[in-house]
C-alpha cells in the first residue's frame, strides 16, 4: 500500500565505478516503513551485458562478481537495462508515491550517479534528498568509534544482501548512536 513515509532502499552492482564507461549489472530494492521495518522486497535483477563489457571489468570486479556467481547470472540474463528499470518502477509504485522517498542506502551517491546516467526515469522517482548510511558511519568513526566498530559487515557484494546490511547498519546506529 502506498505511503509517502515509506523508504526506498536500492543497491546496484556495476562493472566499475565510472558511470560514463561502466554499466549496471545487478539491482535490487527494498521498501521499509519509516521505522526501518521491511515491507516488501522488490525484484532482484541481473541485467544482461555482453561478454565484451564483462571482459572490460577490472581485477577486483572480475574476481568479486565471478566468485559470487553474478557474472554468470548476467551472462544468462535476458533482461535489458530498460526492462530492469520498468520492473523496479512498477514495484515501487505499489509502495511509495513518486518523489516522496529519499534514495536510501550505503554510499548511495554512487548508485544515484549510475541511475542518472543509465536509468533516468528511476532516478527521478526518488526525492532529491539522500538517506546515506555511510554518513552516520563516518560520524561514528570520528565521534564514537566503538559504535562503528561494533557493527560487523559481511558483504557479499550482491545487491539484495547489501541492502539488508545497510538497513541493519542504520538500525544499529539508531539504537546505539542517535539519541532521541
Swiss-Prot record:
Its EC number is 3.1.15.-. GO terms for molecular function: 3'-5'-RNA exonuclease activity; nucleic acid binding. The keyword Translocase does not apply. Its main location: cytoplasm. It is found in: Cytoplasm. One of its GO terms (cellular component) is cytoplasm. Residues 7-170 form the Exonuclease domain. SUPFAM superfamilies: Ribonuclease H-like. Keywords: Cytoplasm, Exonuclease, Hydrolase, Nuclease. It comes from the Bacteria. GO terms for biological process: DNA metabolic process. The active site is at residue 128. Pfam families: RNase_T. NCBIfam families: PRK05359.1 (NF003765). Belongs to the oligoribonuclease family. 3'-to-5' exoribonuclease specific for small oligoribonucleotides. PANTHER family: OLIGORIBONUCLEASE, MITOCHONDRIAL. This is Oligoribonuclease. The lineage of its organism: Bacteria, Pseudomonadati, Pseudomonadota, Gammaproteobacteria, Pseudomonadales.
